[in-house]
Amino acid sequence: FESVTAVDSINLTIQSGTYCCLLGPSGCGKSTTLRLIAGHETPTSGDILISNKNVTVRPPAKRGTAMMFQNYALFPHLNCLENVAFSLKMAGHKKAERNERAMAMLSLVEMQDLKNRLPSQLSGGQQQRVALARALVGNPDVLLLDEPLSALDPFLRKQMRAELKQLQ
């Protein structure tokens, strides 16, 4: 096998309230970089700073980040509303509050009418919108999106770009 270097060296400063897109060919380390920032991978050297705070050893839930994975990572046994509200439940929010916040995010991505459906009952684009709502519900400092528009049709892709810009 060839020697594989997963993200050799990177220094990246992103101003608050701005977009940053990582572009490159498949296998160049874009997803790995996002997973490192989110805390789902551990760097072998260097530090990860968010808002000038070293978060390198913090678990994902303590970093102020949310990641929407390329494969969506929705819980198959939970409906849309429960998927979006899950992190709020784990954080100890009361059911009424978490359902209200989850519904607001489902409305934002135009999935409120499908709140009771399981992921297996949704199209790829619908699953992607639920995953985005789940990433947004905790109001993260840093939102990490891995291929956020890939499963959307051209109309929804344009609409989602506008919604992401509005969230900025």
Summary of predicted features, one role per range:
Residues 118-122, 126:
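Conserved ABC ATPase signature
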Residues 54, 89, 96-113, 163-166:
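Conserved ABC ATPase "signature" region
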Residues 23-25:
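The feature captures the beta-strand-to-loop junction immediately N-terminal to the Walker
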Residues 143-146:
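Catalytic Walker B motif of ABC-type/P-loop ATPase nucleotide-binding domains
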Residues 137-141:
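A short, proline-enriched helix->beta-strand linker immediately N-terminal to the Walker B motif
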Residues 78-86:
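Short coil-to-helix segment of the ABC ATPase nucleotide-binding domain corresponding to the Q-loop/switch region
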Residues 53-69, 90, 94-99:
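ABC ATPase NBD coupling module
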